[in-house]
Amino acid sequence: MAEEFLNQISAKCSVIIIGAGQAGLSIAHSLQKKGIKPLILEKNYVGFSWKEQRWDSFCLVTPNWQCTLPDYQYSGKDPNGFMDKENIVKYLKKYSEFVKADILEGIEVKHLVKKNEKFFISTNRGNFEADQVVIATGAYHVPNRHPHSERLPTNILQIDAREYKNANSLPDGPVLVVGSGQSGCQIAEDLFFEKREVHLSVGSAPRSPRRYRGRDVVDWLDRMGYYSMPIGEHDDPKSVRNKTNHYLTGRDNGREIDLRRRAIEGMNLHGRLEELTINDIQFSNDLSKNLDGADSVYCRIRNSIDEWISKNGIDAPKETKYTPFWEPNEDVKGTKLECKNLSVVIWCTGYKSDFRWVDIPVFDGTGIPVHERGVTQSLGLYFIGLPWLYTWGSGRFCGVKDDANYLADIISLRTNKSAATKEMMECKALLGS
């Protein structure tokens, strides 16, 4: 049915959703429950980013029981496990079949503008008009790289995290992974387990326990209300949206990542990447500081769980205090890596948003959407699926349903109000004739 829209030069819709990921599908389902049938425009296909922009051994870092899309709770045999990318794609596709929304795949939105209270969308396959628009394209669009990355010799392959698949897909030789967030640490481990020579540039990313005092840490944090805490109640609401996620893994049925252990086993750790030339790469002498900082967050999480257990009188097994068991021997000037000893550099330094196609003044000076729980100052324009849209869970499988239901209420109210206004105007016209 959705393909019928392409037969029109300018298709008109009540609500258009841009993006058919978990956020777009969730808001579509919530709207349909209120009698509103939206149209979803998807640049690629359902599940694309999970299938094509994740490495082969990728797994969720949160347990499967947290996959709670609207009216579609995970129902598999391993609620405490961690879905691999193949099963994540299956989960999303099955949810798409459950939602039964009108989805146009292969539609890339080029321009969105608002005129006379209507939204006009230009795409690679035609134009669309809508009364209300929901942008569900996420926040991670353009990879970050060091500004001097082009200085590296051309014989060194440079790729971003979303381009990495497995160790065998890379040329032989040593690999430098830049960035120690979730992607960087997990990719470095993936290569290390395949006996590759791995160099990891460690930044200030925090790390998290995997299991503690008898439960997965996600279970404890969920019980403590962290995933449902509104951003306004956070200690640092201004910067929390930009903070790096804690590193740990869902691989091997879930475990911690302790870079000190990997160093003992032979992984080469360096401080933050400082400078690049055609001959060598210079790292800062902050490796000890960065490892200590990650451990400090790790211990704070454990301590907060201890306090909550004590406060609520919960019977849980005790665990010993964490003690670092490896320290780097750093030179005052940091370490240096010669380019001739490298074959690949993988940039795991995050992504930035790119909403330049949205020609509506709803952004701050850095291109980030300004909104109140997804509602912008432009009447009828919304965002969903952004990190910390409202809670920590907003950008995850566990919290998007609450945002979807919230926005569906607002969209429905405005749809009904618009319909009532139109009906009143038609009645007045008839009475006046």
Protein language model regions, located:
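Flavin (primarily FAD) cofactor-binding/catalytic cores of flavoenzymes
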Residues: 2-20, 25-52, 81-433
